[in-house]
């Protein structure tokens, strides 16, 4: 009797789970296109905006910085006030940022658009939390989670190929307009098919912890960005930023110890296994993304020291292979 009842519940929920998966995958697409679709278009952006590679690289930096900062607190905010509500807000702002970037007439305007687009940073973890609120069976959740995360490293290379073709044929602005379309589609699907959910307990948001941690992270990030200039780096500025980051992290730690509902429990931050997982993920993704989505495409398009490939060709030759591997092995890992 119990087995029949469980099967019936799974069957009745089947259609809603499929619809939810479609909505969540569309949301992940909206983020992923912002992260990977521009890689083959960076050279085109430099030419059309009449700027330098360094300036275009800076627009990428501000996007990922923005992603990281928003990822620190938006998932927690979703737990407290509603994950669907927060995800819809993220997607609306992402679409707005894409519009600003598409209309950009210079690098500063493009940077503003990319900062706004960075709100999409926490989309992947938020979709996984929303999926788990719907699918609580571990085995089934692991399979569905793997499907969602398998597209996070690149949509089978299609995003890179399409980005290169659009940039080479219609200019870099067309890439952003496609992002707008995908974000709007995701908004509609999430609004219709996703269900609202929150954490079991919903205390007030720890905004003091949010601000102190975000500021500490930003100071450390700026220090790292300055260090990469090597010979031309302002080492006094680096030292100041590192000190500021350390002080703000101490402030964050003490705030969290006193909070009844902290954003991050310091008990977990003291555990070696926490940092092992975080550092492994950070270092791996930093290396892979910097090489495969930055250095390799730029070198392949360089006409002086590289292969001199077009944007459309470099997408297929450098970005598609590893995206296909990720798409194939994500479900296998799950």
Show which residues each predicted segment covers.
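Cytoplasmic helix-loop-helix junction between adjacent transmembrane helices
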Residues: 115-150
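Conserved MFS/SLC helix-loop-helix module at the cytosolic interface between two early adjacent transmembrane helices
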Residues: 69-105
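Helix-breaking motifs and short loop linkers at transmembrane-helix boundaries and internal kinks
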Residues: 48-50, 82, 103-109, 171
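12-transmembrane solute porter fold
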Residues: 17-32, 38-40, 53, 236, ...
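Central cavity-lining transmembrane alpha-helices of secondary-active solute carriers
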Residues: 61-75, 125-129, 316-329
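Cytosolic juxtamembrane N-terminal segment immediately preceding the first transmembrane helix
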Residues: 1-33, 47, 259
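Paired small-residue
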Residues: 97-100, 108-117
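Hydrophobic transmembrane-helix bundles of small-molecule transporters
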Residues: 168-280
